[in-house]
Amino acid sequence: MTSQASAPKIPQLWVPLPSGIHPSWREIDQGSAAWLDRFGLYSDHAQRERLTRISVGEITGRGGPDGRLAALQWTADFLMWLFAFDDEYCDEGPAAASPDATLLIITKLQRIVEVPWAAPADDNYSAALLELRLRLDDLTTPVQTARWAASFRAYLQGQIWMAANSTYGRIPTLSDHLAVRLDSSGVKIFSTLSEIIHGYDLPAADYDRHDVRGFVEVFAAIIGWSNDLVSYHKERRRSQDSYGNVVDLIAHERQCSVEEAVSETATMHTRAMALYLRLRDQILRDAEPELRKWITDCDSWIRADYDWSLTTHRYVNPDDPADLPVGSAEAPFRAREADQPLPIASVSWWWTLLKD
């Protein structure tokens, strides 16, 4: 559970994927700050400062280093919305511990995603999401919009589960938490953004493949577990008390120290990364150009999130610095264990996708 005790040292994580960034990322970042001000997605000046120092332009530019500028700006604005909403409704605001309040706002937001031309938008977050949803139609195909909308709805629905756990003091099992957090973390949405940024449709025959669906889960887990480690210091100080972080859940379920739980989380990350690389190569063997491009874009998002997370002011607060690593590890954490499946019911099936 989160507390005010000093946060543990976070080890370097193994992310053996290429790094890049769009040359216009600073301009994109400035555009998102102006967009944030347009809708006033903050409660006070201090919160505005925290949000504008996140550098959404950087993570977007890293995730789509050769993407279309208008689509990158939309993506950065959407990520700004996610960060603001996460702080206000999911982690720190009064709705974070109220499933009723969470359900009310989510019902409204889902309607905006589905039928923006007929949905009410009577608060800042609804109005901002409506603007994003209408802009999206000018940038995408119906297929791209539908995939983004499905992943976004899954993210919203996951917030109800998180709020209910917090309200009733319910501590989920690690297995249940890992399954729900694939969606509630919002990370799966990243797997839909590349088609928007680059303007291509991944064929349904590829998108709905059993191994590709599993690949998306591994992709989301890698980013989600990395975020849980890097954000641990911030969450200890700013979030509602809850078991929303994998580190705290491991410490509770294993009855171990936070430092031991950090080490186990890093080991989980390494095993997922090793599996990701093997699945990646397996899928690429017979991949058509769109699937090949999409896989490469997933690589970019994993590396983008990791590089950005080590320098963003969201986690690296100069006034209250976290003990974070520098760069990616050259070798897997606990290398001898890297290829071993995780003995966790909700995710162990990923390893059954390997053909050799």
Curated annotation (Swiss-Prot):
Residues where substrate binds: 181, 234, 314-315
One Gene Ontology biological process: terpenoid biosynthetic process
Pathway field: Secondary metabolite biosynthesis; terpenoid biosynthesis
Keywords in alphabetical order: Lyase, Magnesium, Metal-binding
Function: Catalyzes the conversion of (2E,6E)-farnesyl diphosphate (FPP) to yield the sesquiterpene (+)-(1(10)E,4E,6S,7R)-germacradien-6-ol via a putative 1,10-cyclization, which could require the abstraction of the pyrophosphate from FPP to yield the (E,E)-germacradienyl cation. The only accepted substrate is farnesyl diphosphate (FPP).
TM stretches of this protein: none
Protein's name in the database: (+)-(1(10)E,4E,6S,7R)-germacradien-6-ol synthase
Binding site for Mg(2+) 2: 91
Short name of one Pfam family: Terpene_syn_C_2
Catalysed transformations (reactions): (2E,6E)-farnesyl diphosphate + H2O = (+)-(1(10)E,4E,6S,7R)-germacradien-6-ol + diphosphate
Description of its domains: The Asp-Asp-Xaa-Xaa-Xaa-Asp (DDXXXD) motif is important for the catalytic activity, presumably through binding to Mg(2+).
Keyword match Lyase: yes
GO molecular function, one term: terpene synthase activity
